[in-house]
């Protein structure tokens, strides 16, 4: 991995970090509210998911939220059962994700993206998992010359993204510009790991347009050089 390039992107992020704290705090508050009410054993799954999706409307892609609501509406008991298995932390993550996708696809006859599964994981355990956006991940992998090459959207892509995000989280957790905010939020009751992982997800979202701008600039100047 190109750590120099990662350091550059982190520097860009840190230069605007203070202006993003209010938005990050909104994310932390929203997820804390969701966790305080989480219960898959209630009579009806749909109202629960509708509440979660309404609260997360500004945090994630609307199409993924619609997928969650639609699944809960059409197959409440099936989804409840599958979610209990997805959240069984005694089973390796890759097996849980693929099993959940197979089970859901068997009753819907429709493709379930890994990004939607990541959202289910994130809603339940934001201190352990991240929102997974394949578009952002592919761009970041290219920019950092990451050791794993992505071909399509597979379980390998998801697991590789989580590994990269964990590596970034370790670096951010040691950064003197960001750790005071993490410690301050932990001191008033927020889960420290959750705060850190939300920052990592925010970083990935923040750097995506920077990466795309650089790629477009490089492509333009490469074409001009070839045309000479």
In which residue ranges do the predicted regions lie?
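An N-terminal alpha-helical hairpin/helix-loop-helix interaction module that forms a charged
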Residues: 1-110, 126-228
């Amino acid at each position: 991995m190109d750590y120099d390039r990662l350091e550059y992107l982190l520097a860009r992020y840190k230069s605007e970090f203070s202006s993003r704290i209010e938005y990050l705090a909104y994310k932390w508050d929203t997820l804390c509210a969701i966790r305080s009410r989480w219960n898959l054993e209630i009579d009806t799954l749909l109202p629960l998911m509708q509440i979660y999706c309404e609260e997360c409307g500004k945090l994630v892609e609307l199409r993924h939220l619609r997928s969650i609501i639609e699944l809960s509406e059409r197959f409440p008991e099936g989804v409840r059962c599958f979610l209990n298995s997805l959240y069984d932390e005694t089973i390796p993550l890759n097996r849980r994700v693929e099993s959940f996708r197979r089970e859901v696809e068997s009753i819907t006859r429709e493709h379930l993206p890994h990004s939607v599964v990541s959202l289910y994981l994130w809603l339940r355990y934001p201190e352990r998992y991240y929102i997974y956006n394949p578009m952002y991940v592919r761009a970041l992998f290219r920019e950092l010359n990451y050791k794993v090459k992505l071909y399509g959207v597979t379980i390998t892509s998801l697991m590789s993204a989580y590994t990269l995000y964990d590596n970034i989280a370790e670096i951010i957790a040691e950064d003197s510009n960001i750790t005071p905010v993490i410690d301050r939020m932990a001191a008033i009751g927020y889960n420290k790991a959750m705060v850190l992982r939300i920052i990592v997800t925010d970083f990935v979202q923040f750097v995506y347009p920077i990466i795309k701008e650089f790629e477009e600039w490089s492509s333009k100047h490469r074409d001009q050089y070839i045309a000479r």
